[in-house]
């Protein structure tokens, strides 16, 4: 932009993931007069320091669905915008070191399945075959 606008329909303070997401979604809805105010570069604050982890399964359905939407958005964002996002779906690992935790992980697997999320229950030996550096003596 060559000149700073004198007015805007929407002014978003902060160009982190929250502000950028609000601007993105407003423009998808057809809003044309949206400005982000950021004191440095976009996503250079707390967003830049984040690990970028997006675990999808949560205890509340609405949050799980929102995170699923986020993953779908991140998957298509690079093709849609032409901007490299660096998005990679690597998965995660939940460990159970006692019977109570194992029961909890099994319940989570059932919940994940109900949301259409992929989750596999592995024995300690199977986990170690996938991650050889992992010590499984107490898993």
Predicted regions and their residues:
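Short, flexible hinge/linker loops that cap or flank conserved catalytic cores
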Residues: 2-5, 28, 87
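Hydrophobic alpha-helical packing residues
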Residues: 26-27, 112
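Short, intrinsically disordered, charge-balanced linker/junction segments flanking boundaries
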Residues: 135-139
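Glycine-rich FAD pyrophosphate-binding loop
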Residues: 27-48
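Dinucleotide-binding Rossmann-like beta1-alpha1 core, especially the glycine-rich loop
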Residues: 52-133
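Beta1/beta-strand and adjacent pyrophosphate-binding region of the FAD-binding site
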Residues: 3-18, 35
């Amino acid at each position: 932009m060559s000149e700073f606008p004198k007015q805007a329909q929407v002014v978003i303070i902060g160009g982190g993931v929250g502000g950028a997401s609000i601007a993105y979604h407003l423009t998808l809805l057809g809003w044309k007069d949206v400005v982000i105010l950021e004191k440095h570069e976009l996503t250079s604050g707390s967003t830049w320091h984040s690990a970028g982890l997006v675990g999808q399964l949560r205890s509340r359905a609405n949050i799980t669905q929102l995170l699923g939407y986020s993953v779908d958005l991140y998957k298509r964002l690079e093709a849609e915008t032409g901007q490299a996002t660096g998005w990679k779906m690597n998965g995660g690992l939940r460990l159970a070191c006692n019977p109570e935790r194992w029961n909890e992980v099994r319940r989570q697997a059932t919940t994940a399945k109900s949301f259409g999320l992929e989750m596999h229950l592995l024995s300690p030996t199977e986990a170690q075959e996938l991650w050889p550096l992992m010590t499984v003596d107490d898993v």
